C-alpha cells in the first residue's frame, strides 16, 4: 500500500536537503500518516483506514459518513 492519506490524498513529495554549504541532496517529505479505526454507526462496525493528521481533523469536522462518500480509495 502506498503512503498516502485516503481522505485528503496527501502523498510524499520530493525535495532537497540543504547543507550549510548549500549542497543539495535529494530527500522525501512524508505525510503524517496513521492507521486509525473509525466506528460506522450505520453499519455497526469499525473500518480501518490510513489517514493523515489533517485527515482526522477533516473527519472530526465533516463526520465519517460524509468523508467515506468522497474517499480517494474505497474501503
From Swiss-Prot:
Keywords: Ribonucleoprotein, Ribosomal protein. GO terms for molecular function: structural constituent of ribosome. It holds the Pfam family Ribosomal_L28. Disulfide bonds: none annotated. Transmembrane segments: none annotated. The keyword Secreted does not apply. Belongs to the bacterial ribosomal protein bL28 family. This is Large ribosomal subunit protein bL28.
Amino acid at each position: 500500500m502506498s503512503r498516502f492519506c485516503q481522505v485528503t490524498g496527501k502523498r510524499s513529495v520530493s525535495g532537497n536537503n540543504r547543507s550549510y554549504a548549500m549542497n543539495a541532496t535529494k530527500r522525501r517529505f512524508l505525510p503524517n500518516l496513521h492507521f486509525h479505526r473509525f466506528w460506522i454507526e450505520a453499519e455497526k462496525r469499525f473500518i480501518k483506514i490510513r489517514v493523515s493528521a489533517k485527515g482526522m481533523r477533516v473527519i472530526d469536522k465533516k463526520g465519517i459518513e460524509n468523508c467515506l462518500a468522497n474517499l480517494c480509495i474505497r474501503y
